[in-house]
Regions:
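Substrate-binding cleft of carbohydrate-active enzyme catalytic domains
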Residues: 301-455, 469, 476-484, 490
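Acidic-aromatic substrate-binding/catalytic surfaces of carbohydrate-active enzymes
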Residues: 29-115
């Protein structure tokens, strides 16, 4: 049962008076207990404290305390003001039922009025607790005249030290990069430094896996960040969770743009506590898709194919493209390098060097081979003449440039275009219509970060922030792309992580090539960002190269072990676009076609690895805090993924010497009796697991991939009851809100928890129901077989399957 305790309503009824307001300084603390959450407003501190509780109501963890939410705004006179709860004389606490993207629940609202600066404004903080989800949502608003402006709102703002975890070197803070440019990396810092993470972060203990996840679920107006100063491997000294980020890491020079009144709200912030922080990150991703579903328009399976930039680069040619496409169709496809739908992609990148007729012919011949042909486009970056006409308009490129401090602004050698400008949009429309007419159905979008720069102003009225401009431009682009019967696959390259819903895929890192250092860089992104494949249909490891062009990171003499490692990094990330020059008749000098074809025999024709890659999923780090060299920005070595039939475990070695070790089976979420055989997929050898650990030895610059075959009836393979014969479970699937689903569960015994998985074993939803016989689980749009695990109050587990058509 849900229990809400509002102490001030009882003890301060005289002071509160009509309307429920009371004067700060004369009140007791406000304490709200709702499910597993305890939200307190501490009067003496003029600040909030949020605790998570155990099932019995006892305290479990203080997530943050002395949080004096902070708003910076310009008043009607244009004067800059900063306010916190202590700035206001009065506070009113109310509650109301909510029914939004996250389900039904209660919104607890704190309204602060009569600021000491004399402005006619009020500050409002909401905490929303939901019946069907174990996270809470909070946001902060400043309200007043329509003339007010704000570019900084911090729903969580802590400036006094508190203990988050007991001191341990296993405690970590996750830094998520804003974009993937400049070889940015995910970091997992020990809790003895400062960092700023963008859009989301996690604090966790690597051994217990217990963790806190905080991040934004709205990405329409603001760039968001979480800044932390930590010490003593467990203490938080400063914590700011805010909308209004503007740093060199967001590619900005100007301060964040100001939003306009009369009501300005921060992004809604997800606050979650999880027994396993990795599950918490996945829950955060799914919470985002409740607000904005992913772009899942691609129905032709996991991308397997070729990409021209990895080796041919600027020396691409029509003849090489045709020869390579034929090689893929005639040799690689029959030998297993193809997805389960028989589809391959031929991706032509920048510097395609193709005439219009050659483009049309390449698409036609590819279609006859069952191949989808792709092209390259940079919608928001300009590399050409300033006086060039834009699309069908009379605007020149210069008319469309974004300006910073009055001057055209460039990143990486290209000038940034205003995504909202009609000239930019006409150019985008003209180019995309041309490509679609020529037959391209796969489009790589590069340098989209150029459209996410804070500028002096934007063409579109009402657009004042970089995030608004970016959304404006990409919503137009996807509208043009999706016109017609056959949508295009949109593959985002250099781009921000959020917003995510415009791309079918996104590169997990910057340019990534062939050698073991490139593999390590790719796996760094999966170590910290595997969960992003719940935002995108596919995570993209960039072009997979075996025999390079001879440039940095792309030597011609990589070892077979390095080839295996790089190929595997693609298989455990989500896409398989190999980029070698396989054209024997090409005389560009880039690559070595004969050697690449020889390597393809040993690497690309491994059907077990290709079958694993066809899952199109990113593998989860086994540990989450064991970087291979002890550095915060390094990759981990061990990754895993469960399906109904198999457990896959990939172990990388990024070093010059052999590595060996063992992984406890408990860390792989499998028991000794749950599987019958283990096969190492690169050697084909059967592996004997004697005790409670998987032992491994990996040669220098190489990888091992272990596949556990699950016994029938293990895990959630069969819809049968575990322990007890009397309990019964009935499941019904109904249409839900926002195109989603509602799973209605009727149980003959009181329920404690519901877990819903897809056929690959990925957790889609976990919901505590605490003693109910009936439960309704809201799901994002999904099709196929769903697997349900219902944990009863008495400890029994019931399993069921449900098909969604």
């Amino acid at each position: 049962m849900r229990n809400t305790l509002l102490k001030p309503i009882l003890s301060l009824s005289v002071l509160m008076g009509a309307g429920g307001y009371f004067t700060q300084g004369y009140a007791e603390d406000i304490v709200i207990v709702d499910g597993l959450w305890k939200i307190s407003y501490i009067e003496n501190d003029h600040a909030f404290r949020v605790n998570v509780l155990n099932e019995d109501g006892s305290a479990r963890k203080c997530l943050f305390t002395r949080s004096a939410s902070e708003a910076v705004y310009d008043n009607v006179a244009g004067e800059s003001r900063t306010v916190t709860p202590a700035s206001f004389a009065d506070i009113k606490q109310t509650e109301e039922k909510v029914n939004d993207e996250f389900g039904t629940g209660t919104s607890y609202t704190f309204t602060f009025t009569r600021p000491d600066n004399g402005d006619d404004v009020q500050m409002v903080q909401r905490f929303c607790v939901y019946e069907e989800n174990d996270f809470l949502i909070t946001d902060l608003s400043i309200e007043g005249d329509e003339a007010i402006r704000s570019n900084y709102l911090a729903p969580v703002s802590v400036s006094q030290m508190y203990v988050l975890f007991s001191e341990s070197e296993d405690n970590r803070m996750l830094k998520v990069p804003f974009d993937n440019d400049g070889w940015t990396r995910y970091n997992k810092y020990k809790m003895n430094t400062s960092m700023t993470s963008y859009e989301v972060t996690a604090w966790f203990n690597g051994e217990t896996k217990e963790g806190i996840v905080i991040g934004a679920v709205d990405h329409d107006h603001w760039k968001n960040a979480i800044s932390v100063e930590a010490s003593d491997n467990g203490r938080v000294n400063v914590l700011k969770v805010y909308s209004g980020a503007s740093t060199s890491e967001t590619r900005d020079v100007l301060p964040h743009g100001k939003l306009k009144g009369p009501k300005i709200s921060s992004a809604r912030m997800f606050v979650g506590f999880a027994d396993d922080w990795r599950t918490g990150m996945e829950t955060f991703a799914r919470a985002n898709t409740m607000v904005q579903p992913m772009r899942d328009t691609w129905d032709k399976g996991t991308p397997f194919g070729w990409q021209s930039w990895g080796v041919l680069e600027k020396k691409n040619s029509f003849d090489a493209d045709v020869e390579i496409a034929d090689y893929y169709h005639e040799v690689l496809k029959p030998n297993g390098f193809v997805n389960s739908q028989g589809m391959q992609i031929i991706g032509i990148d920048s510097w395609d060097n193709l005439s219009t007729d050659e483009r049309i012919k390449l698409c036609k011949e590819g279609g006859e081979n069952g191949q989808t042909v792709g092209l390259y486009f940079t919608p928001f970056s300009w590399w050409w003449g300033w006086s060039d006409k834009m699309g069908s308009t009379q605007y020149t490129a210069e008319d469309c440039f974004l300006k910073v401090n009055g001057e055209p602004y460039s990143l990486g050698g290209a000038i940034c275009l205003d995504p909202t400008h009609p000239g930019t949009k006409s150019w985008i429309s003209t180019r995309i219509q041309e490509m679609k007419k020529q037959g391209f159905r796969f489009l790589k979008l590069d340098f989209t970060s150029h459209g996410m720069v804070q500028a002096d102003s934007y063409y579109a009225k009402g657009v004042t922030t970089a995030m608004e401009a970016y959304n404006n431009g990409l919503s137009y682009l996807t509208k043009v792309v999706d016109e017609g019967d056959e949508p295009m696959f949109l593959s985002f390259s250099i781009s921000p992580l959020f917003p995510y819903h415009y791309g079918n895929s996104r590169r997990v890192g910057c340019d990534t090539w062939a050698d073991i250092g490139q593999t390590e860089y790719c796996m760094n992104a999966i170590s910290g960002g595997w969960w992003t494949d719940l935002l995108y249909q596919y995570n993209d490891p960039d072009h997979l190269v075996m025999v390079g062009s001879g440039g940095w990171g792309s030597p011609k003499n990589c070892t077979l072990g390095e080839n295996r490692a790089r190929f595997t990094s693609g298989a455990v990330t989500g896409m398989m676009m190999v980029a070698d020059n396989f054209a024997l008749n090409d005389d560009s000098g880039n690559g070595d076609a004969a050697l690449s074809r020889a390597r393809a025999q040993e690497i690309m024709m491994n059907k077990d690895i290709n079958e694993m890659a066809d899952l199109g999923r990113s593998f989860m780090p086994v540990y989450g805090h064991k970087e291979h060299n002890g550095n915060a920005d390094a990759a981990e070595t061990c990754f895993m993924h469960h399906t109904e039939e198999y457990l896959y475990v990939a172990v990388f070695n990024y070093t010059d010497g052999e590595s060996s070790g063992s992984i406890p089976l408990s860390g792989l979420d499998i028991a000794l009796g749950d599987f019958d055989t283990v096969k190492e997929l690169w050697s084909g050898e059967t592996v004997v697991v004697d005790g409670e650990e998987l032992s491994y030895k990996v040669p220098a610059k190489d990888v091992k991939v272990f596949r556990f075959h699950k016994k029938p009836g293990s895990g959630i393979a069969d819809a049968m009851s575990e322990g007890g014969k009397d309990a019964r479970l009935d499941v019904h699937i109904l249409p839900g809100s926002n195109g989603g689903l509602e799973m209605n569960i009727d149980s003959s015994a009181p329920l404690r928890k519901i877990d819903v998985f897809d056929l690959q074993g990925r957790l889609l939803k976990s919901q505590n129901v605490r003693g109910l016989y009936n439960a309704c689980v809201a799901l994002s749009p999904v099709k196929g077989l769903l697997l349900l695990r219902a944990c009863l109050q008495e400890g029994q587990v019931l399993l069921a399957k449900a098909m969604v058509h």
